[in-house]
Amino acid sequence: MKKTITLLILILSYSLSAQTWGNREYWISYEYTPKADQISEFEKAVKEKTNKWNTNFETAIFTFEVVNGPNSGTYERWVTRKDRSFFDQDFSKEIEYWKKNVGKYIADQSGQQTWRIFKGASYGWDPENTTINKFYQQNRVVVKAGMTAQFLRAHERMAKLMKALNYTGNRAVFRIENGGNTREFAVVYGFDQHGGDGSGIWTNLPEGSSVRDAYNEMFGYEAWTTDWEASSKAIELWGNLAQKTRFRPELSTKLQ
C-alpha cells in the first residue's frame, strides 16, 4: 500500500510538473557583433537570410540593434512565443546557411539564450498585441537564490494595476531559463518616442492621484513601499545590464 501511494505521488508530481512546463512561454535570443568594417555586408546577409528562412509566423525572427552602453553596435535576434516543442525541431540546414553566408561577417557572438516570460508580471505583451515599438529598454538584475517570489510580487501587482487603469504602454518580465545565469531577470518595456507620453499614459488614473496612490488603493495601506522594498532586497546584483535597443524592421520577418 505504501509503495502504491508513493508511486501515485510521483506520477501526480510529474503530471503537475509537465503541466507547469507546458504552460510556459519561451523567447529565444541571439547576439551578434559584426566586424567593424563589414557592417553593411552583415546587414545585407541578415536580410537575405531572413527573407529566405523566416517568412511566416512559425519561423519569425526579429532584429534589434543596441544603441547605447558597452554593447553598442551589437544586434539582437529574437524568436518569440514558443513552447518546449520548438527545441525538438531540426534547424541544422538553417544554421549551416547562417554560418556560410552570415558568419563570415561576425566578429563576436553569443550562444542561444532561452528566456521565460512571466505572464502574470507582464502587461501589453499578449499575442494579440502585435505592434512592435521603435525602442526597447532592457534593465537586467540578478535575484538572490530563493527570492524570486519576493522580487516578482511588485511586478505582478504593477501588471494588474496597468490593466485596471488602462495603461497605454507595456512592460514585461523575463528570466533566463537556459544559456546563462538562471537567476538573471530582464524587465523590458517598449516605446516610440523619448519625450512626452512616449512610454505610456495611465488612462484611468483618477485626477490628482499618483500611480503610487492607485497602487496603495488597490493593494492596501503602504503596499507600494512594502512591495518595492521587498523586491529591491531580493536583488543580489543591480545594474547587471541596462541598455536600449532599436527595432530594425528591414532585418526582421514581415508579418501581415
Listing of model-derived features with the role each one plays in the protein:
Residues 18-256:
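Short S/T/G/P-rich N-terminal loop/turn motif that feeds into the first structured element of a domain
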